[in-house]
């Protein structure tokens, strides 16, 4: 079963469903939603993402994508409104069979982006999610040398996932870092 998960509507939704030739359709929305004629022909439905918290929205979208992947191939089509950017981010993070966007009512396939974070960097992010720590404390928690901690922190800071905390001694996770591990 090929399924399209989307926040699109109108011509863009119709064009995306034709381009992906899906049998299933899941429309994600945040509130008011008008059913389309297309839904009568495809299996699926609409899912309301009921949260103001972007991290929780990402977790919910991830659950939906992973649950849908169990039944076959998954494609994502999004626009820049509301859930669209989060849907794109999670689709790239989790990995889907194709990502599409709509530009001037034309459907454009986008390349999949890979968020390449090593296991050690992921451990550091998960620890910093719980509390801010110094490089020495991180080394003790992760059980690596302080030099390696600084190397990993530098890479994470360049990606915008970690920053020096207000005390300038400790490191803390950024909002982007929280999204990357959500």
Q: For the regions a protein language model found, what residue spans apply to each?
A:
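Long, low-complexity, Lys/Arg-enriched
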Residues: 1-73, 82-88, 92-182
């Amino acid at each position: 079963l090929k399924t399209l998960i989307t926040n699109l509507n109108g011509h863009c939704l119709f064009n995306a469903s034709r381009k992906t030739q899906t049998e299933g359709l899941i429309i994600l929305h945040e509130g008011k939603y008008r059913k389309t004629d297309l839904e009568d022909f495809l299996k699926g439905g609409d899912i309301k993402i009921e949260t103001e918290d972007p991290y929780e929205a990402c977790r919910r979208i991830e659950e939906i994508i992973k649950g849908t992947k169990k039944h076959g191939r998954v494609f994502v089509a999004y626009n820049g409104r509301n859930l669209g950017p989060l849907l794109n981010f999670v689709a790239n993070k989790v990995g889907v069979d194709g990502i599409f966007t709509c530009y001037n009512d034309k459907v454009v396939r986008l390349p999949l982006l890979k968020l390449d974070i090593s296991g050690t960097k992921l451990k550091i992010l998960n620890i910093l999610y719980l509390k801010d720590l110094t490089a020495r404390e991180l080394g003790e928690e992760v059980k690596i040398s302080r030099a390696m901690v600084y190397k990993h922190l530098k890479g994470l800071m360049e990606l915008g996932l970690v920053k020096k905390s207000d005390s300038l001694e400790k490191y803390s996770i950024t909002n982007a870092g929280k999204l990357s591990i959500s």
